[in-house]
A protein has these predicted regions:
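Generic start-of-chain signal for non-secretory N-termini
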Residues: 1-18
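NTP-dependent nucleotidyl-transfer catalytic core
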Residues: 12, 18-43, 47-324
Length: 324
């Protein structure tokens, strides 16, 4: 039994009121010198037909020893309680040792779903220090939510789509000297850097890259195979880092996963009359919320990160019906 429960039980024994209600009325004093817990006796003034200071003094005189409480003091209309620090430390350590890894767990979440997105690495690029804060904080939140009784869903929203993969394919086909599965991510990065160096001298290479990405979009077997190999290689390498960090995910659905889901989002926005066109770009006007507009389609018809993010949020809500 915790201190608040013991205090509430002691007051209940003197007043005949419900301990649960009394516990809810307990407060934390603004100054530690005033105690660790404070009971506002004005709550009892109507029932006991006495002034709060008189009630506080009466309770202080009638309540005996309370386990975990060193002393109590009537102060104005409050009855202040001072915790027995030695007993508190001993009891806490006993609970920690007894509960082990489950210490602090609760059923607060009631099994409800919570989505936590973290790490979100880029394919064909190494895991670096910039990914570490999101990965560590996100995984901590994931574990905390699980301990609180939620069904946490860890999501690694991969950066696995875009013309950069067309560039990667061009670079690999020109200068790659072994099968992709035998490469390292750093070797892929070197090829990618070389592409940009060569493209400055030969701009037509950018057209090749766009053509290869178009092949990925259209499902060309060779293009999709290479793209998938880049993805598999990256996840294999970064998986070793995640294992060392004790990080896990339930979903690796990234940008590519939402490519075929953005059309429905755009249609829904249009049907609801939320889209406007400004200088060729299609956007949602958010001026009523004192926010800049959210661009959904560029003037050339291309989607943006915001478009994918909307598709991801809607998909996750429909799939997981998350509460957070």
């Amino acid at each position: 039994m915790e201190n608040k429960q013991r205090i509430a039980a002691a007051i209940a024994a003197q007043t005949g009121l419900e301990a649960d209600q009394l516990r809810d009325w307990l407060e934390t004093p603004p100054d530690p010198a005033m105690g660790d817990y404070a009971f506002p006796c004005f709550r009892l003034a109507k029932t006991m037909r006495k002034a709060p200071p008189a009630i506080a003094a009466e309770l202080a005189g009638s309540i005996g020893h309370i386990d975990g409480i060193a002393s109590m003091e009537a102060k104005g209309g409050y009855l202040n309680f001072f915790a027995d620090k030695t007993a508190f430390v001993r009891d806490t350590l006993d609970r920690v040792l007894s509960a082990g890894d489950s210490y602090g767990d609760s059923d607060l979440g009631g099994g409800r779903n919570v989505c936590v997105e973290y790490s979100s690495i880029n394919i064909a690029k190494p895991f670096h220090i910039g990914h570490l804060p999101s990965t560590a904080i996100g995984n901590s939140l994931y574990r905390i939510y699980k301990a609180l009784g939620y069904n946490a869903i860890g999501i690694n929203h991969l950066g696995d789509w875009g013309t950069q993969f067309g560039k990667m394919i061009v670079a690999y086909k020109k200068w790659g000297d072994k099968p992709v599965p035998q490469c390292t991510v750093r070797e892929l990065v070197k090829l990618y850097v070389r592409f940009h160096e060569e493209a400055e001298k030969h701009p037509e290479m950018n057209d090749e890259a766009r053509a290869w990405f178009k092949k990925i979009e259209s499902g060309d077997k060779e293009a999709v195979t290479l793209w998938q190999q880049f993805k598999d290689l990256t996840l294999k390498e970064v998986g070793k880092v995640y294992d060392r960090l004790g990080v896990r995910f339930d979903s690796y659905a990234g940008e590519s996963f939402y490519e075929d889901k953005m059309g429905a989002v755009i249609d829904e926005l249009r049907q609801k009359g939320l889209l406007t066109v400004d200088k060729g770009a299609t956007l949602v006007d958010l001026s009523a919320y004192d926010m800049p507009p959210c661009i959904i389609l560029r003037s050339d018809g291309a989607t943006l990160y915001a478009t994918r993010d909307l598709a991801a949020a809607i998909y996750r809500k429909k799939t997981y019906d998350f509460v957070k």
